[in-house]
UniProtKB/Swiss-Prot annotation:
InterPro entries: Ribosomal_uL13, Ribosomal_uL13_bac-type, Ribosomal_uL13_sf. Belongs to the universal ribosomal protein uL13 family. It comes from the Bacteria. GO terms for molecular function: mRNA binding; structural constituent of ribosome. It comes from Nocardioides sp. (strain ATCC BAA-499 / JS614). This is Large ribosomal subunit protein uL13. The lineage of its organism: Bacteria, Bacillati, Actinomycetota, Actinomycetes, Propionibacteriales.
Length: 147
């Protein structure tokens, strides 16, 4: 018997909406990356994009555990000598929480063409509203552990 390999026509994509209110950033990123990759499906294959579309609302209400708001840094480099810039995650969350969530999810996806294609299926919004009502997104609940 031959191993099944999913074809692009076999993949049924869903739209899922996640409310990020009081959800720890890392747990949110792990669940979102798994949904974008399609690891929750029986037809998952690492070389095929089998994932779903994910909408994250209330991005500004995401939580950080411990004192990560001040100690965890996001690094950028300009390409010039001495061009390394370190910014605390808490500062990025205050400025634009959508960027912080996208950066956390991108860190958990493959760094290739397939990963970039998966990241395009992620839609992050700061408020409770999103412009994807026509897709009839089903709510996805992230199981929380008390902090």
């Amino acid at each position: 018997m031959r191993t099944y390999s999913p074809k692009p026509g076999d993949i049924q994509r869903e739209w899922l909406v996640i409310d990020a209110t009081d959800v720890v950033l890392g747990r949110l990123a792990v669940q979102t990356a798994n949904l974008l990759r399609g690891k929750h499906k029986a037809i998952f294959a690492p070389h095929v994009d089998t994932g779903d579309f994910v909408i994250i609302v209330n991005a500004e209400k995401v939580a950080l555990s411990g004192d990560k708001a001040t100690t965890k840094m996001a690094y950028r480099h300009s390409g010039y000598p001495g061009g390394l810039t370190a910014t605390p995650i808490g500062e990025i969350l205050e400025k634009d929480a959508r960027k912080a969530i996208e950066k956390a999810v991108w860190g958990m996806l493959p760094k290739n063409k397939l990963g970039r294609q998966m990241l395009k299926k992620l839609k992050v919004y700061s408020g409770p509203n999103h412009p994807h009502q026509a897709q009839k997104a089903t709510p996805f609940e992230i199981k929380q552990i008390s902090q």
